[in-house]
Amino acid sequence: MQGVQEQIEELQTKLAFQELTVEELNQEVIKLNQLIAHQQHQIQLLIGKLQAMEPSNIATQAEETPPPHY
């Protein structure tokens, strides 16, 4: 009977450690989800700023007049 009791206690100990590990992993997932949400918000802000930028007054290479030949 002692062997069965030891096995039960060992299983209970393992279960307690697994529950702790699951909780720690859950907290990490929550942190990562918050980080992802923050980064997505930052990306949306950057997209908005890029779209709001006015075009440059500098001519592109295609629009530039070719230099005179010597």
UniProtKB/Swiss-Prot annotation:
Q: State one Pfam family annotation.
A: SlyX
Residue pairs linked by disulfide bridges in the UniProt entry: none
Similarity section: Belongs to the SlyX family.
Q: HAMAP family attached here? A: SlyX
| Protein's recorded name | Protein SlyX homolog
Q: What is the species of this protein?
A: Shewanella sp. (strain MR-4)
Query: Its gene?
Result: slyX
